[in-house]
UniProtKB/Swiss-Prot annotation:
Transmembrane segments: none annotated. It comes from Ipomoea purpurea (Common morning glory). Usually encoded in the trnK tRNA gene intron. Probably assists in splicing its own and other chloroplast group II introns. This is Maturase K. Belongs to the intron maturase 2 family. MatK subfamily. The gene is matK. Its main location: plastid. Disulfide bonds: none annotated. It is found in: Plastid, Chloroplast. GO terms for molecular function: RNA binding. PANTHER family: MATURASE K (PTHR34811:SF1). Keywords: Chloroplast, mRNA processing, Plastid, RNA-binding, tRNA processing. GO terms for biological process: mRNA processing; RNA splicing; tRNA processing.
Length: 502
């Protein structure tokens, strides 16, 4: 353990960066399963780390470098790991991912003081007040679908800047070429490969390192092009959800795109950049022509920097006044709200019509109904159905589960400007709960509710928890009036699973 801690010292790591010998440390695999460097990802401890020894790791790595073993193919055995592919690949890949994270963790530790100084409320809802204050002045949004590298060598070259150990990079090449389809790393939920299901740390590390590389290039080019420093904000949740905003965001690739310097460089332009669910979103108060130039710039950037044939169809230019932005489970837009003001001057009166921009957040009811249908609470049309898998639970547990789901929905979408759609969700969950209870007692829904009363389920779906929020009502205001307002909570640290629709 002391030897591993020695590799975490900045002075020693900067001198040689030799991470490959750590693969032969048995305790490194126990750390990979128990806690990790930052305890960011929790893995289920299945007890197979007890089966690991120095001889197993040495034998597996030796097999990787045996050319004759690669040429031997069997339909029942893996090329490298043999019949215990699921076990050995998980051991080595998680251990390798844990070790190769050391340079990044050192960077995180060195910059920890700067991160603590940032104003981070550690709440997803803290983002929306910022959007309300700033997005009302913006006009267009670039919705960019982040491309994935088609060639595996791009991933290796990305890590080459941080990991100087050639042996570790060679081992990474063997891992990637053994599972040659990179889609199993970037889409683990959709893949049926067992490797994609058991290598979450490896998947997150590859994806985050790739995204961190291209965003660091943007930040570097921005600081080189303008004297005005950008203001950054970061919140890191479980290492896979990252949000950042940059004011006056202008980046010019002066080396390869000198001709675009006069087109994009504008110190007075206010722009905001953030990344969410595999997308990069760039919002600006500029014109459509300027956003088209940014579209052209991004295409050339990906092609020249990462050798990616990036199509313009992967970038959507939307006007906030007429289109909604899918962000953090909300459909956000800035519609023009007409407002008429009557002015009286002596005997003359005037009617002044003004169009006011207002940040609007809407609950995406159709995708949420699709998520409820996928979770077997209703059909695709939104008609409630029973939940047979919960029929074996007690009545109180069934009601509490349905009520807990609805309360989570209500709390997360409390900032919506139109809450009428929440009653549709309440209707689906309430009737699904009644159907589940009636199925358990082998009765009809009507007979079950008549025996217990119509208010039996109402109290479980209307009782709200007292949670500190951004809205502090007056003593004279009623509870009903409070919930008509938009409320942003301090304790929302993750999106509801049913709200995080695919």
């Amino acid at each position: 353990m002391e030897e591993i801690q020695g590799y975490l010292q900045p002075e020693r790591s900067q001198q040689h960066n030799f991470l490959y010998p750590l693969l032969f440390q048995e305790s490194i695999y126990a750390l990979a399963h128990d806690r990790g460097l930052n305890r960011s990802i929790s893995f289920k401890n299945t007890g197979y780390e007890k089966k690991l020894s120095f001889q197993i790791v040495k034998r597996l790595i030796t097999r990787i470098y045996q050319r004759i073993y690669f040429t031997t193919y069997s339909s029942n055995k893996s090329q490298i790991f043999g019949p215990n592919k699921s076990l050995y690949s998980k051991l080595l890949s998680e251990g390798f991912a844990f070790i190769v994270e050391i340079p990044f963790s050192l960077r995180f530790i060195l910059e920890r003081k700067k991160i603590l100084k940032s104003q981070n409320l550690r709440s997803i809802h803290s983002i929306f007040p910022f959007l309300e204050d700033n997005f009302s002045h913006l006009n267009y949004v670039l919705d960019i679908l982040i491309p994935y590298p088609p060639h595996l060598e791009i991933l290796v070259q990305t890590l080459h800047y941080w990991v100087k150990d050639a042996s570790s990079l060679h081992l990474l090449r063997f891992f990637l070429h053994e599972y040659c389809n990179f889609n199993i790393f970037i889409t683990p939920k959709r893949s049926r490969s067992p490797f994609s299901k058991i290598n979450q740390r490896f998947f997150f590390f590859l994806y985050n390192s790739y995204v961190c590389e291209y965003e660091s290039i943007f930040l570097f080019l921005r600081n080189q092009s303008l004297h005005l420093r950008s203001t950054s904000f970061g919140a890191l949740f479980e290492r896979n959800i990252f949000y950042g905003k940059i004011e006056c965001f202008v980046k010019v690739f002066a080396k390869d795109f000198k001709a675009n310097l006069c087109l994009l460089k504008d110190a007075d332009l206010s722009m905001h950049y953030f990344r969410y669910r595999g997308k990069s979103i760039l919002a600006s108060k500029g014109t459509l022509l300027l956003m088209s130039k940014w579209n052209y710039y991004f295409v050339n950037f990906w092609q020249c920097s990462f050798c990616l044939w990036f199509h313009t169809e992967r970038i959507y230019i939307s006007q906030l006044s007429s289109h909604s932005l899918d962000f953090m489970g909300y459909l956000s837009s800035i519609p023009l709200t007409p407002s008429t003001v009557r002015s009286q001057m002596l005997e003359n009166s005037f009617l002044i019509n003004n169009a006011i921009k207002k940040f609007d957040t809407i609950v995406p009811i159709i995708p949420i109904i699709g998520s409820l249908a996928k979770a077997k609470f209703c059909n695709v049309l939104g008609n409630p159905i029973s939940k047979p898998v919960w029929a074996d639970l007690s009545d109180s547990d069934i009601i509490e589960r349905f009520g807990h789901i609805y309360r989570n929905f209500f709390h997360y979408y409390s900032g919506s400007s139109k809450k009428r759609s929440l009653y549709r969700i309440k209707y689906i969950l309430r009737l699904s709960c009644a159907r589940t209870l009636a199925r358990k007692h082998k009765s009809t829904v009507r007979a079950f509710l008549q025996s217990l009363g119509s208010e039996f389920l109402e109290e479980f779906f209307t009782s709200e928890e007292q949670i500190l929020s951004f809205t502090f009502p007056n003593a004279s205001s009623t509870l009903r009036g409070v919930y008509k307002r938009r409320i942003w909570y301090f304790d929302i640290v993750c999106i509801n699973e049913l709200a995080n629709y695919q």
